[in-house]
Amino acid sequence: MNLREFARDQSCVACGARDGTVVLAHYFGPRRHSYGGGIGHKGHDAVGAHLCARCHADMDTNMRNKAKRWEASEIFLHYCALTWIRVCDALAQRRAA
């Protein structure tokens, strides 16, 4: 399964929007180096969340705010977990079909 393509038909895990702007947003918080990310390149697709354009922009803003960085990181990683639950459920449905 291509995780980036799969995101296109999904709703946003943060707000529920299904507005055609949902993408696999890559985690880029303070732990990004642990997940293969760094300056100039994205981390592993496994550490991504289905976010709409508005929620993606909100996460970008909060990650850049030093006062909110760790809280935003925890929230983003929660969204990644919700995305993985969705992916696992979809894979299970495909196997059952």
Language model features with spans:
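Short cysteine-rich loop/turn motifs with clustered Cys
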Residues: 1-28
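Histidine-centered catalytic micro-motifs
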Residues: 22-30, 49-59
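General secretory precursor processing signal
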Residues: 15-18, 55, 83
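Polybasic, low-complexity binding patches
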Residues: 34-49, 57-97
